[in-house]
Amino acid sequence: MLYKDNNQIYKVDSMGDLTLMLYQTSQARLPDQTLDSWMLGCADRVQALYGVAIDCHSPEIFAEQLVSLGLLYPLH
């Protein structure tokens, strides 16, 4: 599967892999930040910018919600 954000294209096998790729390439990630902490921080930023709450209980749901909000785009 291919997904695109404003900066990159991600080739992944699952939505969980997509979240992991976003985490690994994030410019907002702190050096010692965990995946869960990073997802919470992203959810806070999305809430502040767009007024939408994102469920970050799992990497799969997190990525699905980013796609459903149009923050990530599937490439066919």
Where in this protein do the model-derived segments appear?
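Exposed alpha-helical structural elements
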Residues: D17, T34-S37, I61-Q65
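Short, compact, well-ordered microdomains
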Residues: V52-H76
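Acidic, aromatic-enriched beta-alpha/helix-loop junctions
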Residues: Q24-G51, D55
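N-terminal acidic leader/helix
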Residues: M1-R29
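Generic detector of bulky aromatic hydrophobic side chains
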Residues: L2-K4, G41, D55, F62
